[in-house]
């Protein structure tokens, strides 16, 4: 687990990743947004999230979590039809259930991103959000502080 202290580098957006082998990794990606007909789009951030969550090019779904966070995960139907690509992720299942959505089995790598601001841009996970994720992760893995 990487450190939770300090702010991200200027222009970077921090997000958390829960891997099927039980790791919690904090990543960052450029957060610059381009204007599109649908609003601002953070191409580099979403490419980094997609590379973690679904490198096989399937659909990605989003789930609203507590404290303004959102989870990004591989489409459940895609994960069910190609289980070799999307391994069971019991730690993510527990972490997400603790952060809002009903308990269900999750598969593949799961990303947790920060709050969407009034302009539609996803912000970096705050120190408080990272501490909450880390706390729930420790409980899910029975890791002492």
Model-derived regions, located:
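Short beta-rich binding modules
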Residues: 1-145
């Amino acid at each position: 687990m990487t450190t939770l202290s300090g702010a991200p580098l200027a222009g970077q957006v921090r997000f958390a990743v829960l891997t099927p082998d039980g790791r919690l990794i904090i990543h960052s990606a450029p957060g610059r947004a381009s204007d599109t007909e649908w609003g601002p789009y953070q191409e580099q951030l979403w490419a980094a999230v997609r590379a973690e969550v679904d490198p096989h090019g399937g659909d990605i779904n989003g789930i609203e979590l507590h404290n303004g966070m959102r989870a990004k995960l591989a489409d459940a139907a895609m994960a069910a039809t190609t289980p070799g690509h999307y391994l069971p992720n019991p730690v993510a299942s527990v972490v997400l259930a603790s952060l809002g959505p009903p308990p269900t089995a999750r598969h593949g790598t799961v990303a947790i991103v920060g709050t969407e601001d009034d302009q539609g841009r996803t912000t970096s996970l705050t120190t408080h959000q990272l501490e909450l994720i880390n706390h729930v992760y420790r409980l899910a893995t029975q890791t002492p502080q």
